[in-house]
Amino acid sequence: MTRRALVSVSDKTGLVPFARRLAALGVELLSTGGTQKTLAEAGVPVVGVGDYTQAPEILGGRVKTLHPRVHGGILYRRGLASDEADVKARDIPPIDLVVVNLYPFREAVAAGKPFETCVEEIDIGGPTMVRSAAKNSAHVGVVVDPADYEKVAAELEATRTLSAATRFYLMKKAFAHTAAYDAAISEYLTAREAPEAAPAHFPATLAAVYTKAYDLRYGENPHQAGAFYRAAREPEEPSVAFADVLQGKELSYNNLLDLQAALAGVMEFDETACVIIKHNTPCGVSTGRTAGEAFARARECDPVSAFGGIVALNRPVDEATASELTSLFLECVIAPGYDAAARAALAVKKNLRLLEAPRLGAARATWRRRPEEGRELRSIPGGLLVMDRDLGSVRRDDCKVMTKRAPTEQEWKDLLFAWKVVKHVKSNAIVFAKDDRTVAIGGGQTSRVESVKTAVMKAALDVRGSSVGSDAFFPFADGVEEIIKAGATAIIQPGGSMRDAEVIAAADKAGIAMVATGMRHFRH
């Protein structure tokens, strides 16, 4: 039978109705600080923990519930003779239900509060009570989520106690709650540079907090279950995870992956640009005078693959752009915004998912990345691979001309465009670019020469006179020879092959230009 409950919550959602239902069952309520005040003002009978323990709060409220009469009442094992003797000797009544959620530490961090303020929001007594109650779940219920108030109240009203199954369910939630809380603290401190020294680039222990945003219909395939988890803090750069979904069907696992690929690609450009993604790799990229023109030019690169694609634009969508978008079946569009006319035009495509990421419209120089946002995580069974995100870029001055002929001004422009795109194509990656757009893309092949052949074979536009980007060096001259045969006139690649001399000789023989970046962009 539940006779006594300790209630101390920061999130007071649903608190008073829940407490009233407990009080109506004859449950004695113990409470502290703001929770006690809220209950008393609502007319709910409540006993202050200080009165209960005869030990007033000290240290400005830092010590309230850390007392044997509290934790003894929570932790004692009913029916165990030695525990029964201890609580009897010390006059410690049982506490059968603990209702606690923790100080808003994550909210303080998200609000950008000073370090000292965030530290004060690290809860001590709350997690201790939650863990004590969860450990003793054979006898005690612990509620950390207001969403469980109805379930707990209804069961107590029906049976005056909580079943073993309910207590176990609550125990699991409680330990997940405190684990996430501690991980948030660790993540915050890991990302913060200590006054005396910078932190290790990769910490010895990696703690990260993600909360389930929603279940997905399935994972990559229908036989795989899936869910989407969101970080505690919104990044200061454009983010699919925090974008607003304005219309369309629910997002799928594959939609989210493809949207991220599209967003990452379009974020390379200051100019008005469009990226079209299919199966997590670009099938068309272009800049334009308007967003609509950028989309139309990108679509022309590979109109077959663009069907059913995912589109990212770095400028707001107007009616003219919306008209272009509705000319093709698309799965998703992400952009900084949509005007009213565009929304009306796109509304006819009821299944088209529209996402709005306002920060995408801001100047790239204004985006900031916290240390944890500069990392990329991928799991393997039994482990986690962690690396810096590939945010590398090059300027013209970073490149070394490898051939006798240097690129022309137009070739330089096309080369740097191709280099921005090729880092987002699955390796081995080849991109033909001309006049600020891709004209052919080949990727995902197990040899570089085959990626060149694939790009040329799939090209819907004329590749003659284009410039080519390669995500890694050419191990043999065959890839360069195929590029020459296709009619391209310049190449940008990392360089560094054992056969660089052979590759350069092939380029010089054909009179094409080649530059080395010294930077590789493998993508697996």
UniProtKB/Swiss-Prot annotation:
Entry-linked InterPro entries: AICAR_Tfase_dup_dom_sf, Cytidine_deaminase-like, MGS-like_dom, MGS-like_dom_sf, PurH-like
An annotated Gene Ontology molecular function: IMP cyclohydrolase activity
Record keywords, A-Z: Hydrolase, Multifunctional enzyme, Purine biosynthesis, Transferase
Superkingdom of the source species: Bacteria
UniProt pathway: Purine metabolism; IMP biosynthesis via de novo pathway; 5-formamido-1-(5-phospho-D-ribosyl)imidazole-4-carboxamide from 5-amino-1-(5-phospho-D-ribosyl)imidazole-4-carboxamide (10-formyl THF route): step 1/1; Purine metabolism; IMP biosynthesis via de novo pathway; IMP from 5-formamido-1-(5-phospho-D-ribosyl)imidazole-4-carboxamide: step 1/1
GO CC term (a single one): cytosol
Listed Pfam families: AICARFT_IMPCHas, MGS
Stretches assigned to the MGS-like domain: 1-144
SMART domains: AICARFT_IMPCHas, MGS
The protein's Enzyme Commission number: 2.1.2.3, 3.5.4.10
PROSITE patterns: MGS
GO biological process terms on file: 'de novo' IMP biosynthetic process
Catalytic activity line of the entry: (6R)-10-formyltetrahydrofolate + 5-amino-1-(5-phospho-beta-D-ribosyl)imidazole-4-carboxamide = 5-formamido-1-(5-phospho-D-ribosyl)imidazole-4-carboxamide + (6S)-5,6,7,8-tetrahydrofolate; IMP + H2O = 5-formamido-1-(5-phospho-D-ribosyl)imidazole-4-carboxamide
Domain comment as written in the entry: The IMP cyclohydrolase activity resides in the N-terminal region.
Similarity-based family: Belongs to the PurH family.
Name the UniProt record assigns to this protein: Bifunctional purine biosynthesis protein PurH
Gene name for this UniProt entry: purH
